[in-house]
């Protein structure tokens, strides 16, 4: 399945889980557990078509930046063999042509924007980002809003290693 199709399905399900503002269809997605700062959700299919982990920022700067609804996701698509696909909901559309970065310690990754969302460009970079997240303590996502303001959302990575294990055992 193409990335665009998976993303469309994923965000439809995230809406259903009440993670994004829109009418909910709670029977499609359910929260299984929370592990420190991460929550695990799955669809209702057996075997699962998808599962995802999500977390909200612990800090947003500037405080009035308007990144309302920001979230980081790690999605799994068992039928397509996708075990850990990272993405970010920024909570605002980015300034055209601006760069989005995800930083964990000294490592930095460039993301691309699609409206209010950001993705890693290729599978190799996805794996490197997820591995850095598993080993790190915080993730800082920086993007530029349409007015030119640089916005940074900082996420805790506490519990992600255990949450990833739970994601894999639940979804695969």
Report residues per predicted region:
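N-terminal signal peptide c-region/cleavage motif recognized by signal peptidases
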Residues: 21-23
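Bacterial N-terminal signal peptides that target proteins for export
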Residues: 1-13
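Terminal low-complexity, poorly structured segments
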Residues: 15-16, 25
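A generic "folded-domain core" signal
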Residues: 25-172
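Acidic/proline-rich low-complexity IDRs
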Residues: 2, 18-19, 159
């Amino acid at each position: 399945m193409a990335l665009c199709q998976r993303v469309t399905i994923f965000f439809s399900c995230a809406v259903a889980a009440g993670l994004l503002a829109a009418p909910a269809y709670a029977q499609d997605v359910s929260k299984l557990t929370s592990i420190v700062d991460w929550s695990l959700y799955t669809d209702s299919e057996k075997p699962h078509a998808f599962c995802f982990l999500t977390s909200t920022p612990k800090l947003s700067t500037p405080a009035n930046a308007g990144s309302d609804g920001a979230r980081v996701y790690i999605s799994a698509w068992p039928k397509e063999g996708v075990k850990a696909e990272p993405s970010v909901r920024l909570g605002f559309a980015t300034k055209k042509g601006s760069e989005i970065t995800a930083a964990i310690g000294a490592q930095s990754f460039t993301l691309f924007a699609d409206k209010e969302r950001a993705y890693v460009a290729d599978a190799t970079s996805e794996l490197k980002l997820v591995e850095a997240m598993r080993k790190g303590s915080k993730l800082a996502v920086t993007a530029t809003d349409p007015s030119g303001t640089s916005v940074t959302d900082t996420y805790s990575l506490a519990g992600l290693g255990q949450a990833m294990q739970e994601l894999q055992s639940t979804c695969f």
